[in-house]
Amino acid sequence: MEKFIYSNIKKWIFLPVVSDKERFEIKNAIYNSDLKKNRSHYFNGRWENIYLSHNKIPNLGKILFYAGQIGKNIYGKTVIVPRKDLGYHLNEYWFNISKPGESTGWHDHKKGAKLSGVYYIDVPTNSGNILFRNMDFNKICDWEIESQTGEMILFPANQKHSVDVNMSTRDRISLGFNLYTLPIKEIDQEDGYAFSKYYG
């Protein structure tokens, strides 16, 4: 697998075939769900992750299947996003709604995952870019990718990342997920990413 660095970032950004109408349907389904029922990672006055059932979100399977196909090309082995409807005990995907003034701190994802990713459902202008952190000869190097509606970014699961403050007047909505190679030995802890991997 190639290094995840700024100079080759275009190899990690993709554009799934999902129409504006399909994204609108996803957004509507999210807002019509009980957003307080299944959520986790309460930091800085907001819940980071919202977990919604696969059968309540139209077109979700299509997006996650695409992530698996692209992930295989990157990693060189078959990878999937575990889901309850596929027989796994938890979902390795979650939704993130960042309201105006909110941000996401530095973190990485679960140890067992090989790749992680984000799909942008609705990203208003000035609602925050995704930032990545690499160590270069013991020097911290931070860099960013402009978040754009309809794009998908994959990256190594142990890659530290965060999201800038939402400076817009609208919610920023994205889908996060983890990809695992088969067979999956075990998926530890709760849905999403581990509390111990959050750097605030």
Where are these regions (language model features)?
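Non-heme Fe(II)/2-oxoglutarate
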Residues: M1-L86, F195
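Catalytic core of non-heme Fe(II) oxygenases with the double-stranded beta-helix
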Residues: G87-L154, N158-Q159, D164, R170-S174, ...
